[in-house]
């Protein structure tokens, strides 16, 4: 009887109200995904079934806060996700804070309070609000900001936060059943596409060009396997460059912006009108269901809109915390380096480059370099963030090494030695680093023409052989002019598709590469040869270029 009364009494007692921290709530969500018993979780955390259902319903908000939080300590202290009274002001202020942090500008507590007051006046709000120290503390706790001062705003790489974000990302991918085909990353890079390296000596012997400062910003995006590469988006200053007139198809997308940079409007338009349709088309191509989900991984930038704005049905975005971007952003793990390596080594003649190279050529070069990055580069770039995923090996390691490795040409030491042992000319006054810079840039040429020292000088070719060489060279020049005219003509005809134009431009690239194998690519070598002939007429230079002037008295001394 007594036991029944005790049981009835215990049953009638109300359970003490327990408010879990955000970290505990995220742990519950993770354990529910693993299939752990709800009853066991209720007993461990001393909560009811309705509480578990509420936590599960707010899982997306919890994970979003976790991803954007700068400090894991905020998860251990904060217990609710209540919104502030002035929600719009809070959102605008936090967005401003993220912009300044991404720019590397320190933001202190007083600065944040003054900016909040400024936004309050600009929005013409009437609801009373006191921007005090308590308000600042609540703002920091609400957004997971650990500390505010001039010394702590510069974000250093946080390895512990990187490990935690990797765990969050893996759980997110497992929850939605995502494969590497469904996970994308995007990032921007700037290109000063008309600028040349300063490799020639500044002694007045070489005609100088005014260095071009024409800049493009390129937005690159691809999935984790590298099998689907979104058409790059180039942003320039001009709305309709003269080089685009009459061209029906561009190999990449192009937008104009005053500073040649990505802004929120351009990025949002790219997301909804280029990225999302391209992803869905790719899913149809590989046989995935139309309702398959896709994730776009971004870093915090003033150019990117909020996560809530970058959503389209089954396609959504997540942001890397600022403190782990340098450690986990796939673009920083070799993709950007491989792209830039391919971009700065195009099969374009060095002579006449600044004046003949226009923005259309640069865009074609961007498309060529982006498509030439080996798929294995993309796959390896995700190893830090997603180490548990397995990829189907695509390109060989040799292909990746050829693309990414920056090594001096194998004949660099030999060439440099001959230059410095030769007659007194510009080559003897060059620094090793400047010569190596151009040798590395011309590394795609199989064998560089040897510069022969006076002791190795050879006799010039006979007049008949020279005439034959000049005739053959003229034929190559005529073919090059005709080929370029054909490409320009096809660009202005609507009957050619983008794929057909790409094939024609690829063939044009092969032709130009073969043409360059017949002549020195590096302008420095031409300068050395010309000066050697001018200062020492008895020296002849052995080269594959048949039209180089040469003294008929060479070797008669």
UniProtKB/Swiss-Prot annotation:
Localization terms from the record: Nucleus
Domain DDE-1 residue range list: 213-382
DNA-binding region, residue range(s): 38-58, 110-142
Biological-process GO terms, alphabetical: positive regulation of canonical Wnt signaling pathway
Domain HTH psq-type residue range list: 11-62
Disulfide bonds: none
Database matches in InterPro entries: CenT-Element_Derived, DDE_SF_endonuclease_dom, Homeodomain-like_sf, HTH_CenpB_DNA-bd_dom, HTH_Psq
Described function: May bind DNA.
Protein's name according to its UniProt entry: Jerky protein
Upper lineage: Eukaryota, Metazoa, Chordata, Craniata, Vertebrata
């Amino acid at each position: 009887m007594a036991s029944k009364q005790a049981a009835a009494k215990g049953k009638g007692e109300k359970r003490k109200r327990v408010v879990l921290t955000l970290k505990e709530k995220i742990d519950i969500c993770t354990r529910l995904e693993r299939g752990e018993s709800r009853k066991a979780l209720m007993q461990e955390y001393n909560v009811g079934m309705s509480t578990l259902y509420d936590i599960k319903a707010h899982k997306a908000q919890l994970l979003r806060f976790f991803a954007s939080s700068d400090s894991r300590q905020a998860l251990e202290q904060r217990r609710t996700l209540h919104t502030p009274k002035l929600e719009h002001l809070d959102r605008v202020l936090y967005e401003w804070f993220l912009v300044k942090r991404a720019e590397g500008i320190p933001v202190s507590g007083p600065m944040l309070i003054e900016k909040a007051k400024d936004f309050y006046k600009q929005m013409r709000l009437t609801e009373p609000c006191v921007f005090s120290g308590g308000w600042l503390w609540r703002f920091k706790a609400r957004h997971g900001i650990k500390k505010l001062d001039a010394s702590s705003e510069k974000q250093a790489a946080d390895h512990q936060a990187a490990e935690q974000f990797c765990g969050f990302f893996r759980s997110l991918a497992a929850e939605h059943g995502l494969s590497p085909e469904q996970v994308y990353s995007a990032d921007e890079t700037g290109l000063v596409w008309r600028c040349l390296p300063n490799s020639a000596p500044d002694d007045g012997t070489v005609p100088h060009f005014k260095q071009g400062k024409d800049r493009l910003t390129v937005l690159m995006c691809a999935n984790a396997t590298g099998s689907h590469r979104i058409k790059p988006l180039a942003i320039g200053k001009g709305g309709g460059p003269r080089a685009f007139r009459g061209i029906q198809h561009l190999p990449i997308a192009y937008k104009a912006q005053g500073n040649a940079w990505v802004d929120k409007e351009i990025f949002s338009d790219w997301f909804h009108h280029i990225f999302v349709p391209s992803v869905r088309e790719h899913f149809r191509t590989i046989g995935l269901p139309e309702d398959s989900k896709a994730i776009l991984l971004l870093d915090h930038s003033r150019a990117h809109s909020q996560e809530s704005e970058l959503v389209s049905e089954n396609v959504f975005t997540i942001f890397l915390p600022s403190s782990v971007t340098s450690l986990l952003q796939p673009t920083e793990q070799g993709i950007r380096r491989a792209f830039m390596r391919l971009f700065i080594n195009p099969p374009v003649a060095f002579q006449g480059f600044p004046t003949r190279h226009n923005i259309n050529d640069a865009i074609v070069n961007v498309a060529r370099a982006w498509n030439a990055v080996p798929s294995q580069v993309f796959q390896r770039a995700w190893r830090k963030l997603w180490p548990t995923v397995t990829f189907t090996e695509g390109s060989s390691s040799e292909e990746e090494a050829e693309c990414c490795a920056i090594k001096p040409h194998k004949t660099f030491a030999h060439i440099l030695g001959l230059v410095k042992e030769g007659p007194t000319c510009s080559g003897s006054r060059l620094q090793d680093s400047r010569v190596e810079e151009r040798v590395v840039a011309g590394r795609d040429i199989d064998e560089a023409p040897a510069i022969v020292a006076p002791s190795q000088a050879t006799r010039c070719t006979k007049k008949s052989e020279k005439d034959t060489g000049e005739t053959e060279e003229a034929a190559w020049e005529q073919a090059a002019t005709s080929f370029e005219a054909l490409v320009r003509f096809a660009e202005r005809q609507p009957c050619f598709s983008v794929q057909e134009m790409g094939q024609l431009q690829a063939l044009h690239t092969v032709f130009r590469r073969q043409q360059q194998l017949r002549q020195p690519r590096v302008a420095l070598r031409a300068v050395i040869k010309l000066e050697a002939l001018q200062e020492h007429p008895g020296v002849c230079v052995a080269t594959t270029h048949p039209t180089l002037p040469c003294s008929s008295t060479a070797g008669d001394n």
